[in-house]
Amino acid sequence: MKTSKEITINKKNKFGAEILCIGSEILLGNIVNTNSQWIAEQLAILGIPHFRQTVIGDNPARLEEAILEASNRSEILITTGGLGPTPDDITTKVIADTFKTPLEQRNDILIDLRNKSKDKDSKLSDSQKKQSLVPKGAKIINNYSGTAPGIYWSPKENFTILTFPGVPSELKEMWAKEASKLLISNNLSKEVISSKVLHFAGISESLLADKIPHLLISKNPTVATYARTGEVKVRITAKGENSEETNRLIEPIKKELTQITGLKCFGIDNETLEEIVFKLLLKRKETIAVAESCTGGGIGSKLTKIPGSSKIFHGGVIAYNNSIKQRLLGVPEEIINTHGAVSKPVVESMARGVQIKFKVNWAISVSGIAGPTGGSKSKPVGLVNFCIKGPKTLITWEENFGSNKTREDIQKLSVLNALDRLRLSIIMAN
């Protein structure tokens, strides 16, 4: 799998891509527009700069105006929404009208619609057939999960439109299987933009930025930091005449970053913490089990999303109730009564118990107060205790993620913190 992507960018007056999301339900705030964020991430992965995101309601005149404006300033316009059989699905027709191009009915789309119809013997309705109309000369972006296909079309010089349905799962599948490949293969110039993303844990964005001020002012490659819950990303982006040149520019920056930050850097491009933990345990031929309270199985869920995780993950106990901690994990009642469920002695006992129960090399336990209620002056919301028990390792620690965080944030931070400490513990055990 490629760890950096590239695409050529035209050097004429127009530059980059923009995103246009269509639908009155987005404009009115009835649904959250996650498509723009996801497309922006994909453009960054491909190395395509983008400078504008717009939301337009289901209004033909305003939609045509937005499309015309985009065609005069950008090379690529990506739209979501407004594809389908209903009257407010106007995107394809408005695009065709904007560039004075007739719509043509595509037999291949009609066949696909019939195959996807529940009643294959009945005739398609006019509203269903509407989805088979595309601007003359446009390529089809097949919809594998839904009925409305998208288009890939260059209606004028140095301008390409890609359309997608508004359903996120359909958009993502169409992008992965066809659209991203079309963007990469249809080169527009000899200039190449390549990027590589480094992932960091256990360090804040500001502290990381303080360590690399000389890199952040670099022009080619550019270096930028991005903070996410429990993680910081650094994107290195380079321009050149070919991928060999851009990779030569990126490599020394990447090397310097990892030297400065050491083990704080846990992955590159699409690597996740749980994948790194999985690979480390697999290499050592070791196994793990989890005992979770406030995270509700979040650590186990992360690990079991990885194909083949049964080779290293034996199981877990979600011990939310104190009686379960005692009965299934063997935590002594007196320890809970003396120290409280959220304490280092309790998580140590949980880790020992789950390690014995599942006969594994490694065990990790967590107990905390995720809120918004249940906190006290001595044990506030956001306080979480952890333990890692390995073949020759025993670590307990406490984190206070803050009472201003949401329950979901505290759970997510706890899971990521646990996985990162586990990663470091396994590395140190080598």
From Swiss-Prot:
Gene3D superfamilies associated with the record: 3.30.70.2860, CinA-like, MoaB/Mog-like domain
InterPro entries found in the cross-reference section: CinA, CinA-like_C, CinA_C, CinA_KH, Competence-induced_CinA, MoaB/Mog-like_dom_sf, MoaB/Mog_dom
Alphabetized Pfam families for the sequence: CinA (PF02464), CinA_KH (PF18146), MoCF_biosynth (PF00994)
Superkingdom to which the source organism belongs: Bacteria
Family: Belongs to the CinA family.
Protein name: CinA-like protein
